[in-house]
Amino acid sequence: MAQSKYEVTYIISTTLDEESKTALVNRFDGILKDNGAEVVDSKDWSKRRLAYEINNQHEGIYHIVNVLADNDEALNEFDRLAKIDGAILRHMIVKRED
């Protein structure tokens, strides 16, 4: 079965210090890897003003991860844990066609 390309974008709370943010990114990259996905690229996009307030915050750090996966197990686990983690304000997983 061919691997599918996915793009995972999530918004990190600006209340985290740099060390905590790095630990969070490494943790979620590890979740993807541990569940069978290959992380191609993981980088901060930018700190941006939010269109609307989320959890009393007006800004967030956008982080983008490009992933190759044979199935959706890793993405389902990422989705489940991102919903629980209060430091991730929002997240989105998109299957890429390119």
From Swiss-Prot:
Coiled coil: none annotated. Transmembrane segments: none annotated. GO terms for biological process: translation. InterPro entries: Ribosomal_bS6 (IPR000529), Ribosomal_bS6_sf (IPR035980), Ribosomal_S6_plastid/chlpt (IPR020814), Transl_elong_EF1B/ribsomal_bS6 (IPR014717). CDD domains: bS6. GO terms for cellular component: cytoplasm; ribonucleoprotein complex; ribosome. Keywords: Ribonucleoprotein, Ribosomal protein, RNA-binding, rRNA-binding. One of its GO terms (molecular function) is small ribosomal subunit rRNA binding. It comes from the Bacteria. Belongs to the bacterial ribosomal protein bS6 family. NCBIfam families: S6. Binds together with bS18 to 16S ribosomal RNA. This is Small ribosomal subunit protein bS6. It comes from Latilactobacillus sakei subsp. sakei (strain 23K).
